[in-house]
Amino acid sequence: MSFPEEKKMKKLPKYRQIVHFIKEKIGNGEWPIGSKIPSQRTLAKDFQVNRSTVITALEELMADGLIEGTMGKGTVVINNTWTLMAKNSAPDWDQYVTSGIQMPSRKIVQEINQSESNTDLIQLSKGELSAEIFPLAVMKEMMGKVSQHMEAFGYEEPKGYLPLREALSNYLKTIGINVSSSSILIVSGALQALQLISMGLLQRGSTVYLDQPSYLYSLHVFQSAGMKLTGLPMDNEGLLPENVHLTRGERGRAILYTNPCFHNPTGILMSKKRREEILAVSENTQLPIIEDDIYRELWIDEIPPYPIKTIDKNGHVLYIGSLSKTLSPGLRIGWIVGPEPVIERLSDIKMQTDYGSSSLSQRVAAEWFTSGHYQQHVEKVRQQLKVRRELALSALETHLKEVATWNIPKGGFFVWIKILPSISMKLLYTKALSKGILINLGSIYAQEKGNYIRLSYAYASLEDLQKGIYELGLMIKELASR
């Protein structure tokens, strides 16, 4: 739309602006036939009008034969300006988008993902460091250094930028993992590591054993590749390995995923003894392990036990690390450590997928490690997280003591809060969102028993953190009194 047209549109009544907006989306092919249009609530919020204005606009579009409201399905596009005049209809894109290999996220997860970018909301569950902690000045310095020395901006070798892999090899030695750069693959975040494993190492019908609850249940990485998830119970020391019982058919068709340091979502830190027990089960059953250790550096009270990979002498463990939680998710830099044949296989798949992670990001990451700034940064992050954790725990004690219980995490981002069983969690989620607070319910992580919330003390400003917990306490008490 040109600037004069934009000015003209702003002079129209609000309902006409909504009509024009929807017609433009349909006419441009952005919302093809079968597409579900935004809800009345969303449109009212976006255009800053009441719902009656939105209803007026939708009624006009229905009269024009462009949209149709169906009970239980919302309002969908049934025609476009071409098909009203032409004999040939557009492809049924709705059928296509429901036929892809990748399974869609649950509706509540999609809503959370969209809402996490809304700066008007208090993000009480977001698993990311606050902008208040982000080292902007040092990041600019690192990027400046990298840009001065770059002679080209092409693809890197399949396993990733060699100086970064060499820097990671040195870094990993500090936590007891002795590997060469040839056993390290650079990936675009830990999630891509899991996707590569699902595509390259497991066949359809394989079993993925994992902690339950788990962050993995909010995704469909393995299920979309035709695998099934089998949850294993946890206690306060982590996953209970005695519950791993491989059938004869699962040997060679199963893998164990675990998140031992400051587990997402429970915050549990796996004990040294439990790590040894899990590796023993792995060795006895020939069950490979995926060790997702992205929160390791975020310890607050004491240094965590060494990774399982440290005591793995026979190549049973694939170790995943990342800068997304400790430095910046925007860099999209993570790594997998494993036996060389596995790394060769995964690097080949990665090349077929995206031809390598960002060259610029890899160079910036290498600069963080080789300059010594990374270790200085994570020490500051730990100090900030300690302040935030104490603030959150104090606010919880003040405002939720009567209606909830929780753990005290030794590091990471999360407090796992158990709410009174009488509370409707769906109603609490909706009520919180209407008051400008976004929370992640335990159900999205396959927490089957009890009412849980994953609370993050890492992202919201200190003021919003206190305000959000205060409001959450009021809402829970109100629902409990009904």
UniProtKB/Swiss-Prot annotation:
PROSITE patterns: HTH_GNTR
UniProt keyword annotations, A-Z: Aminotransferase, DNA-binding, Pyridoxal phosphate, Transcription, Transcription regulation, Transferase
N6-(pyridoxal phosphate)lysine: modified positions: 325
Example of a GO MF term: DNA binding
Annotated ranges, domain HTH gntR-type: 12-80
Annotated region of DNA binding: 40-59
Cofactor field: pyridoxal 5'-phosphate
Database matches in CDD domains: AAT_like, WHTH_GntR
Name the UniProt record assigns to this protein: Uncharacterized HTH-type transcriptional regulator YdfD
Gene from which the chain derives: ydfD
